[in-house]
Amino acid sequence: MTALRAARILTGEGGTSASPAWLVIGDGRIVATGTGPAPAGATDLGDALLAPGLVDIQVNGSGAVDFARASVDEIVAAIDDRTIGGCTACLPTICSAPLDAYAGMLDRLAAVRAARPETVLGVHLEGPFLGGAPGAHPPELLRTADVEWLQALCDRYGDLIRLVTLAPEADPGHAATRGLSERGVTVALGHSTVDYDGARASADAGATLATHLFNGMGPLHHRAPGLPGAALTYRPLVPSIIPDGVHVHPALVRLALDARPDAVIVTDAVATAAPVAARDGAAYLPDGTLAGSTLTMLDAVQRVVALGVPPAIAIRHATHNAASAVGANDRGRVAPGARADVIALDPDTLALRGVWVDGESLS
């Protein structure tokens, strides 16, 4: 058994404990939490805050490493770097590609998950079944959903396929949405100009997320709310959002998080090798199109707190909400029975002081 004592615990579900607080870890799980005097032998973390490890459900790359193209060893090393930085679970994300390219990419990512099963929850396929708001996705690669191809992919890779972003207009009749959701794959709506009613219809067919709210979708208009309006108001849909201050104005980030306590913050981080260039926390194609961010999950949390969101709530958007959105219900919480993926933070700056994965310290 390992015990940790800190000033307070941010539970991941929006709560903050009394002070002092402690937790006990056994066999990779949190077995007890409490306040007041800590168990004998507890490691004293002083005035630190303990919180769940951060969860990123949309990360395309890190540094110079593109998760769709790099080698297994390169991807593992990049994910390890992000884990040491406080992100203890993630979904490596693949953007639109020719259908015959997916087997090679997924074979590599299956090997990555085999090497890091405690960290890699699965894979997020962002495309190629996208619609009228392609963003950085090459339009020539976009296509109507191929239900048989998706079924074959899920048969081959099983629960490696954790999340699929598609556009309702690329899934007429919602066959792909229904088929994926029936298999336990989370379906997100994105890169779409679908109208409000169409977005609701897709949610009724099984979609439960809206990928990077306000980006890759039609605008929010007071008479035509579109996908943004559905993501903000139709409760079966949970919005994710990139809080770098570039993809979405900070005022609208705050609006979205206030409107949807269950919203998820993501990095949408990409590799910053040519032709992608990084500037002010965002990544751009040569023509100026936004291609993602260069955030870490801890950066994302700190930026949300800078908007006036309380730390416990910012942590919820980056932990419990993210894990719940993809069915990883034993993560993202500091509570008995949850996985012992925990971070320690400075109480004033939220700088990282320590990381534990499966109860093992990485520092």
Where are these regions (language model features)?
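N-terminal metal-binding scaffold of metallo-dependent hydrolase/deaminase domains
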Residues: 1-38, 360
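Residue-level marker for buried hydrophobic side chains located in beta-strands
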Residues: 3, 53-55, 123, 188, ...
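Conserved, mostly hydrophobic/aromatic
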Residues: 125, 180, 210, 304, ...
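Active-site core of metal-dependent hydrolases
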Residues: 150, 155-273
